[in-house]
């Protein structure tokens, strides 16, 4: 085990000098610095660059407070390794695989795997055309998710990405009954804490491993924590042959941390100040999140869109890797429609007649057509009013508004805030409800009866309460 000495510390960047004759550590190797002679507290560094003349530049995974020049640094000879296997279920980890849930720490002999690996080869990959039911109408009808697929939840600040991902955990993890891995990348600690206690109460935690590298962590930890969660998920897929659900909140923070690290390493920034290696880093992460012949990984990733600009390089780079996109729209939040999923901008590879069936496809296409036409008529309505529309257009607008409200529903995880019980709607019920609205069966019911409800039966019950 070769050793060097700290030459300089610049924030989270630590330069380490290895004497002549000492073997230099490889890129991505983990180095360890002990803060005192008793060797109780250590700081882990990851090698990022070799500067020449025995000097390597590293990124710290923890705060560098207390590090000084001349301190001894040991090369572990391998990348950061984290615990894997059944023992990780029900536990909460940080980027290094240390437990942070105040329960017993992992034993030294627990099985560990390095966080840096190659993606599965082309012939190992497997594709599926099985739909993953979420119980959320707007998703199941217009942008369905594939089992073993990749889903992106796009949205600006405060439009409901985390609430949607928590509802998906609530619905899918409980229905799915398999293994789930939740990775919190650079998000609020409070949200992670809420999610942990909620999962503990519901019992889902027993089949879930949680990994957190939150907003207050150094950029190195935020950049690598997604790989820690992915390594745990890969083990269940490859060794245990399981179907795994991988939730990542938020992929943008992974990019943001990479940008910070890139600047600290002295690389020339690229477009909008992002790192020049943006596409490579995203590709290395996303290509590992895949399904093989041994097992599947279904990933649901929240992706923050800076200033609601979808052309920003960070969300634009993520787009290329996804099977389904669920776009959250601020205008719908302003209308009080939750989840604020844009039915026209969201898309899915799975919305094809050979996958979802002819009836589902036809209903989804007609819903999109009606909403698109309503969108076109809104300018005329705003300038000239409803009176200038033909009778046919008035009927279409009335149905479009009912459809728009019926695409909303109350969430189980938001019940504590709204006071309204959440609902889970099976796909068959969703398709039937929208088909009947399109057929004009409920033209006589008030628009408000369609807002925030589950199935079409709930609409009828709500309308009866309103006196219709």
UniProtKB/Swiss-Prot annotation:
GO terms for cellular component: plasma membrane; proton-transporting ATP synthase complex. Keywords: ATP synthesis, ATP-binding, Cell membrane, CF(1), Hydrogen ion transport, Ion transport, Membrane, Nucleotide-binding, Translocase, Transport. GO terms for molecular function: ATP binding; ATP hydrolysis activity; proton-transporting ATP synthase activity, rotational mechanism. Pfam families: ATP-synt_ab, ATP-synt_ab_N, ATP-synt_VA_C. SMART domains: AAA (SM00382). It catalyses: ATP + H2O + 4 H(+)(in) = ADP + phosphate + 5 H(+)(out). This is ATP synthase subunit beta. The lineage of its organism: Bacteria, Bacillati, Bacillota, Bacilli, Lactobacillales. The gene is atpD.
């Amino acid at each position: 085990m070769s050793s060097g000495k700290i030459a300089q510390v610049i924030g989270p960047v630590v330069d380490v000098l290895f004497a002549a004759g000492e073997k230099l550590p490889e890129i991505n190797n983990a180095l360890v610095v002990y803060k005192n002679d008793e060797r109780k507290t250590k700081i882990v560094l990851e090698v990022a660059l070799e500067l020449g003349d025995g000097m390597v530049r590293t990124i710290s995974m923890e705060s560098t407070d207390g590090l000084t020049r001349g301190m001894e640094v040991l090369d572990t000879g391998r990348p950061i390794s984290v615990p894997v296997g059944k023992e990780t279920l029900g536990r909460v980890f940080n980027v290094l695989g240390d437990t942070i849930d105040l329960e017993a720490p992992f034993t030294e002999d627990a099985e560990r795997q390095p966080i840096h690996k190659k993606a599965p080869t082309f012939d190992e990959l497997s594709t599926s055309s099985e739909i993953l039911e979420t119980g959320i109408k707007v998703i199941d009808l217009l942008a369905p998710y594939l089992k073993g697929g990749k889903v992106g939840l796009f949205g600006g600040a405060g439009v409901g990405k985390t609430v949607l991902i928590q509802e998906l955990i609530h619905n899918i993890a409980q229905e799915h009954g398999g293994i789930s891995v939740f990775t919190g990348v650079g998000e609020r600690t409070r949200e992670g804490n809420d999610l942990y206690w909620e999962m503990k109460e519901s019992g889902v935690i027993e089949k879930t491993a949680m990994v957190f590298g939150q907003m207050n962590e150094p950029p190195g930890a935020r950049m690598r924590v997604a790989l820690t969660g992915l390594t745990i998920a890969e083990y269940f897929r490859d060794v245990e042959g399981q179907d795994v659900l991988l939730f990542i909140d938020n992929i943008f923070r992974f990019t943001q941390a990479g940008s910070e690290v890139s600047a600290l390493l002295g690389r020339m920034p690229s477009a909008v100040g992002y790192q020049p290696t943006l596409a490579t880093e995203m590709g290395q992460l996303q290509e590992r999140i895949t399904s093989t012949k041994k097992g599947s990984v279904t990933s649901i990733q929240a992706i923050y869109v800076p200033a609601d600009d979808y052309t920003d390089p960070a969300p634009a780079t993520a787009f290329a890797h996804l099977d389904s996109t669920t776009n959250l729209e601020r205008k719908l939040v302003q209308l009080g429609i939750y989840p604020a999923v844009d039915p026209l901008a969201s898309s899915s590879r799975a919305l094809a007649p050979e996958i979802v069936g002819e009836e589902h496809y036809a209903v989804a296409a007609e819903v999109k057509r009606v909403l698109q036409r309503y969108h076109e008529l809104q300018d005329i309505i705003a300038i000239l009013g409803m009176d200038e529309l033909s009778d046919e257009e008035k009927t279409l607008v009335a149905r479009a508004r009912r459809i728009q409200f019926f695409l909303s529903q109350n969430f189980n995880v938001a019940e504590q805030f709204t006071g309204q019980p959440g609902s889970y709607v099976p796909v068959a019920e969703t398709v039937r409800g929208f088909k009947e609205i399109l057929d004009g069966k409920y033209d006589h019911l008030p628009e408000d009866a369609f807002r925030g409800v589950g199935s079409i039966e709930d609409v009828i019950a709500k309308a009866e309460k309103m006196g219709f």
